[in-house]
Amino acid sequence: MLTVQELVDDNADKIPFSWIAGHDAADRAIPDDGMAAADLVGHLNLIHPSRIQVFGQEELAYYTRFDLRRRMHHMDELLIGGVPAILLADGLTPPQDLIDQCAQHQVPLLSTPVAAAQLIDLLRIYLGKKLAPTTTVHGVFLDVLGLGVLITGESGLGKSELALELISRGHGLVADDAVELSRTAPGVIEGHCPQLLQNLLEVRGLGLLDIRTIFGETSVRRKMRLKLIVHLVRATAQDKFERLPLQDITQDMLGLPIRKVMLQVAAGRNLAVLVEAAVRNTILKLRGIDTLGEFMERQAMAILQSSK
């Protein structure tokens, strides 16, 4: 559960906050009920009291326009609604009654010199990433030709060896073994590596390899967007393979369908070349070029012409 203090600490470099009142409530939780980041923070809004309320110049002018009794009424509405924190932007000084109310009811009241609009944008980006749906999957996550590729498959099939071959061909490692995936936007899944495993690749027989030290800075990536899953299976597996699948295979990841390619592992197959070819083909499909569809159209035209 994200707290107000964590929010302050995590954004200290971009947003310098100063505590005014309610410091004892620094561990107050910011609600996460599957709400979008845009609903978690915004300008002063009494209709949505449960979000972080930001006072800019216009909001403070609106608030101070009322008499003390009306202000107390508005504050009561925010408090009953469970406001997590009140932030004053533009370096504004709050009226004493606002300070007293926040101190009395233990509501965090903070000030920052950052402009209100910029403050809201920064916090929405932060909250969108911090509270994004996440999962951890087993596999190797790579940057192949600028595309985020997750290599999966049962243990012992050579996922790490394949990753090492791709890295030696100029591609980049994001994460090995434990890949943390986050849905940071409606159509975006980002993958990154846990801090403990950064830059490391475990290869059977060689142990742990520090890819960054061995291959240089350009051989690792901090994060990538997941666009393709390459699933390795044994050549003896009973899975039924279609040589020319009429429809793209997808796999659900955090509620999003991700393109999936299945490759059989067998002696003599150059999997690194196959993965690169799969990535290039995926890039073409993302650009609207369907090689199989074009072939089927040509085939249909040829059959039509031969029947005349």
From Swiss-Prot:
Residue numbers annotated as active site: 138, 159, 177 (proton acceptor), 243
Intrachain S-S bonds: none
Record-listed E.C. numbers: 2.7.11.-, 2.7.4.-
The keyword Zinc is assigned to this record: no
Binding site for ATP: 153-160
UniProt: Mg(2+) binding residues: 160, 202
Keyword terms, alphabetized: ATP-binding, Kinase, Magnesium, Metal-binding, Multifunctional enzyme, Nucleotide-binding, Serine/threonine-protein kinase, Transferase
Annotated segments matching region Important for the catalytic mechanism of both phosphorylation and dephosphorylation: 201-210
Required cofactor names: Mg(2+)
CDD domains (alphabetical): HprK_C
SUPFAM superfamilies xref list: HprK N-terminal domain-like, PEP carboxykinase-like
Its job: Catalyzes the ATP- as well as the pyrophosphate-dependent phosphorylation of a specific serine residue in HPr, a phosphocarrier protein of the phosphoenolpyruvate-dependent sugar phosphotransferase system (PTS). HprK/P also catalyzes the pyrophosphate-producing, inorganic phosphate-dependent dephosphorylation (phosphorolysis) of seryl-phosphorylated HPr (P-Ser-HPr).
Name of the molecule in the record: HPr kinase/phosphorylase
